Amino acid sequence: MSCGNEFVETLKKIGYPKADNLNGEDFDWLFEGVEDESFLKWFCGNVNEQNVLSERELEAFSILQKSGKPILEGAALDEALKTCKTSDLKTPRLDDKELEKLEDEVQTLLKLKNLKIQRRNKCQLMASVTSHKSLRLNAKEEEATKKLKQSQGILNAMITKISNELQALTDEVTQLMMFFRHSNLGQGTNPLVFLSQFSLEKYLSQEEQSTAALTLYTKKQFFQGIHEVVESSNEDNFQLLDIQTPSICDNQEILEERRLEMARLQLAYICAQHQLIHLKASNSSMKSSIKWAEESLHSLTSKAVDKENLDAKISSLTSEIMKLEKEVTQIKDRSLPAVVRENAQLLNMPVVKGDFDLQIAKQDYYTARQELVLNQLIKQKASFELLQLSYEIELRKHRDIYRQLENLVQELSQSNMMLYKQLEMLTDPSVSQQINPRNTIDTKDYSTHRLYQVLEGENKKKELFLTHGNLEEVAEKLKQNISLVQDQLAVSAQEHSFFLSKRNKDVDMLCDTLYQGGNQLLLSDQELTEQFHKVESQLNKLNHLLTDILADVKTKRKTLANNKLHQMEREFYVYFLKDEDYLKDIVENLETQSKIKAVSLED
């Protein structure tokens, strides 16, 4: 036991509270000093729990200190102890039987002492004889030790070389096994390196939550059959005023409800406009009457008016009112109905425009929400594909590593078998018990012959006797070949580094093309995206052209509805394109009718 451990044990004996937390090796440096070593050894050997004051004694001492009485210390305490009278020790008298027992024990101890002295003398004689023998054997031992040291030096060099290679191999294997340990060992001892070691529960739960939220969002934002309505929203469905025209929509009930709703809206709008006109007219009449009353009051207050002039004014005003009423009745009966008939469709235009605006706003809203959902789905698909690609890459790497490890295991097993065979050959007594070394190699020394064959290679010339000199020559040639191979390896390493630098440059160029100077990976080619943008711009232009064509078609239909001559021209063109014979018959009938009318007019 070390001195520090003894010191800690004595502290435990005397009841030091924190002795269990102390380490004995941390106190070994205390015993290195010459001055403190004797005291510490005395402390470790003599001090025990009896030298420690109890709690009662400490309390009594503290009470004594508080009382103010003098306490003896040092020399005064020594003098007081000298003056104290020692108590007389009364030794009890022993019996005769006890004395006889003690005498017998003394005799037996003396006999044992004599026997041990005789054994000591015999051992001294034996030691002298063995010392003479040891002197004789020292010369032989020195010669054997020299040979042993030489052989041990060779073996130690080989062992150190093999141990270094094995240590390097074990370090590399441990580093490799750190990556392939099971992930249940914990993150403290096994840092997660591969993607397959990470759990996908959190990622999958998040994806499930996002898909659930996306489905709820689509259910809330889109009603059932939205794509059918959007696909069927052509120009004929938006002509809500023309109730007589058949609709393309298959559901006649929805179409009828929509027509009734539009008719109600148009009627409500016309009624509101009618009430607005009446209110404006009444408001203007009230303003004019108030103005006239103010003027009349002003004229009455400014100067007195005669009754005759007032009657004349009233009669003139009544005549003017009669004329205005006649004009109003004429306007109501004659001009107003024609104007109302001509502008009846204009009254319905705000309602139709509002309906169109509402449908366009709904369509824009749904397209925006569809784009959001589409972007989210594209992100999820991209993340899944990226994860799948990374797993496939890692699986390929693991398969390659597994193949390499299998090949390594096979090579190691083969080398292990060869090593066991060589050890069996070395245990052969003809090889191990050879005392006088000779230049020629024994034919039974299979390991040396095999070594010579390995070093020499394929040599057709066979020698009868193999010597150690030949073995050294072959080893020297092998050394030269190894130096040449090392030079070639250095050149190939330089070429490999140049090849790697070139590949790194290619990788950097590829990264530049993929990232385009940014931090995000471009999943598509820049040229393709530009072409897609061009196509989108062309589609937008095409949409504008289609809207212009639809507007032109609407205006032409309005003109056809208002002009009968254009309607007839259109019918002629339709007949001309569909049925030429029918058109000829109609033209001939019209010519005959015109001739008959001309003849009747001449008559």
Swiss-Prot record:
Organism superkingdom: Eukaryota
For this entry, list what GO says about its biological process. cell division; centrosome cycle; microtubule organizing center organization; regulation of microtubule nucleation; spindle assembly
What GO cellular-component annotations does this UniProt entry give? centrosome; ciliary basal body; cilium; cytosol; HAUS complex; intercellular bridge; microtubule cytoskeleton; microtubule organizing center
Question: Which residues carry the post-translational modification N-acetylserine, per the record?
Answer: 2
Q: Which InterPro entries match?
A: HAUS3, HAUS3_N
According to its UniProt record, where is this protein located? Answer: Cytoplasm, Cytoskeleton, Microtubule organizing center, Centrosome; Cytoplasm, Cytoskeleton, Spindle
**UniProt keywords, alphabetically:** Acetylation, Cell cycle, Cell division, Coiled coil, Cytoplasm, Cytoskeleton, Microtubule, Mitosis
| Record's function text | Contributes to mitotic spindle assembly, maintenance of centrosome integrity and completion of cytokinesis as part of the HAUS augmin-like complex.
User: What is this protein's name?
Assistant: HAUS augmin-like complex subunit 3
User: Which species is the source of this protein?
Assistant: Homo sapiens (Human)
